[in-house]
C-alpha cells in the first residue's frame, strides 16, 4: 500500500502551525469561559453587603461617605458587567487580535492583576472575616481573579509577541 505525500501541518511536521492552531482553540473556549466568569463574580459581589454587615457598619459613616461607597460599588459592578458583556460580544475580535480588542484585553488583564496585588499586598489576612465560608470564598474568588488575569494577559502576549504575523 502506497501513501501519497501530503503537505498538511501534520504531515509536514509544522509544529509551530499546529501549536498556534491549538492555542487559538484554547483561547476560543477560554474567552467564552472568562466572559461568563464575570457574571459569576457578580453573584458573589451581590452577597457582600449582607454577608459583611454593611447595613450596620455603614451607619457609622457620614451620609456623603456612605453614598460614595455605594456609588463606587455600583461602578465596580458596572465595570464587571461591561467586561463580561464585551468579552462575549467581541469574542471574534479578541481571537483575531483586533487592535481595540487587544487594548481592552490588556486593560482587563491589568485590572484583574491589580485586584490580586491589592488583595495580596494591601489587605492583611486579619482584615478578612473569619469562618470557613469566608476562607473558601476568598480562595475561590482569588483563583477566579487569577484565571481572568492570566487569560487576558495571555491572550495579549500571544497576539503581540508570540503569534506568527502578530
Question: Which residues are covered by each model-predicted region?
Answer:
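Cysteine-centered motifs
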Residues: 3-6
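Interfacial loop at the N-terminal end of multi-pass membrane proteins
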Residues: 19-30, 36-79, 89-97, 130-134
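Hydrophobic alpha-helical segments of membrane proteins, primarily the transmembrane helices
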Residues: 32-35, 70, 74, 102-109, ...
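Polytopic transmembrane helical bundles with strong interfacial aromatic enrichment
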Residues: 46, 120, 148-151
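Short alpha-helical packing/oligomerization segments
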Residues: 90-113
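Transmembrane alpha-helical segments of integral membrane proteins
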Residues: 113-127
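Final/C-terminal transmembrane alpha-helix of multipass membrane proteins
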Residues: 137-155
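Juxtamembrane boundary at the C-terminal end of a transmembrane helix
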Residues: 150-166
Amino acid at each position: 500500500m502506497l501513501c501519497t505525500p501530503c503537505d498538511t501541518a501534520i504531515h509536514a511536521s509544522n509544529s509551530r502551525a499546529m501549536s498556534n492552531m491549538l492555542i487559538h482553540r484554547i483561547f476560543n473556549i477560554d474567552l467564552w469561559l472568562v466572559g461568563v466568569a464575570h457574571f459569576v463574580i457578580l453573584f458573589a459581589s451581590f452577597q457582600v453587603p449582607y454577608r459583611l454587615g454593611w447595613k450596620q457598619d455603614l451607619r457609622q459613616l457620614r451620609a456623603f461617605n456612605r453614598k460614595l461607597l455605594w456609588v463606587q460599588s455600583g461602578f465596580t459592578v458596572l465595570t464587571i458587567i461591561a467586561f463580561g458583556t464585551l468579552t462575549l460580544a467581541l469574542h471574534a475580535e479578541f481571537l483575531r487580535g483586533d487592535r481595540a480588542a487587544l487594548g481592552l484585553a490588556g486593560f482587563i488583564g491589568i485590572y484583574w492583576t491589580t485586584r490580586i496585588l491589592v488583595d495580596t499586598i494591601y489587605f492583611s489576612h486579619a482584615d478578612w472575616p473569619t469562618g470557613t465560608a469566608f476562607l473558601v470564598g476568598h480562595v475561590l474568588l482569588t483563583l477566579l481573579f487569577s484565571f481572568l488575569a492570566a487569560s487576558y494577559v495571555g491572550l495579549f502576549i500571544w497576539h503581540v509577541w508570540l503569534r506568527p504575523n502578530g
